[in-house]
């Protein structure tokens, strides 16, 4: 409220001054008045902050200081009005900082825009080297898939190779049994010839020997057949597992 009252008082004073000087108003005077108004508004804003920050007990002191500042500002304004020769020179510095501030802000904005443009460029440059990564991943996945397919394709062939390798030793065992039987057959014939030439006692012994040989010959094919059957079952089991 106090600040508002002060502003109204200053406005009233300015209005009175304008009424008095309606005949000889100059642009320098208008600029000076605008500068004084701006200064008064800034001072009022500062005093408000001080009043809010200070305690209630310190409020009167702050008000007194604000009043003194306002009075000093009014005194300065009157002195400037009295010296008409010095008013244009003083009004120019009052109005000068505003365009400079504007130019400063305008000068900062293009640099900020350039920075903003530089950031997307950097992002695109970073994204460009990172782009080949998906293709490399696809190539790696394709290689792994081809390797797995090759392993699956080779597995039946390896099993097929293992099966003939197992069959070969089994086939080798069968001729061995046949050769053993062929070797025992001449021995049996020789024993029969000896039995015919020898007396009856020897014939009985030879007959027993022949029976033993025949029993052995009969058991060998059975054993070989059993072995062949067992090996055949093993092959079938291996094929089923494959």
UniProtKB/Swiss-Prot annotation:
InterPro entries: IQ_motif_EF-hand-BS, Neuromodulin, Neuromodulin_C, Neuromodulin_gap-junction_N, Neuromodulin_P_site, Neuromodulin_palmitoyl_site. Phosphorylated. Phosphorylation of this protein by a protein kinase C is specifically correlated with certain forms of synaptic plasticity. SMART domains: IQ (SM00015). It is found in: Cell membrane; Cell projection, Growth cone membrane; Synapse; Cell projection, Filopodium membrane. Residues 31-60 form the IQ domain. It holds the Pfam family Neuromodulin. Residues 9-32, 66-84, 98-118, 159-171, 209-242 have a biased composition (Basic and acidic residues). Keywords: Calmodulin-binding, Cell membrane, Cell projection, Cytoplasm, Developmental protein, Differentiation, Growth regulation, Lipoprotein, Membrane, Neurogenesis, Palmitate, Phosphoprotein, Synapse. A lipid is attached at residues 3-4 (S-palmitoyl cysteine). Residues 143-158 have a biased composition (Polar residues). One of its GO terms (cellular component) is filopodium membrane. It is a peripheral membrane protein. Coiled coil: none annotated. Gene3D superfamilies: 1.20.5.190. One of its GO terms (molecular function) is lysophosphatidic acid binding. The modification Phosphoserine is found at residues 41, 86, 155, 157-158, 206-207. One of its GO terms (biological process) is axon choice point recognition. PROSITE patterns: IQ (PS50096), NEUROMODULIN_1 (PS00412), NEUROMODULIN_2 (PS00413). Residues 1-242 are annotated as: Disordered. Residues 85-97, 119-134, 172-204 have a biased composition (Low complexity). Belongs to the neuromodulin family. Identified in a complex containing FGFR4, NCAM1, CDH2, PLCG1, FRS2, SRC, SHC1, GAP43 and CTTN. Interacts (via IQ domain) with calmodulin. Binds calmodulin with a greater affinity in the absence of Ca(2+) than in its presence. This protein is associated with nerve growth. It is a major component of the motile 'growth cones' that form the tips of elongating axons. Plays a role in axonal and dendritic filopodia induction. This is Neuromodulin. It comes from Bos taurus (Bovine).
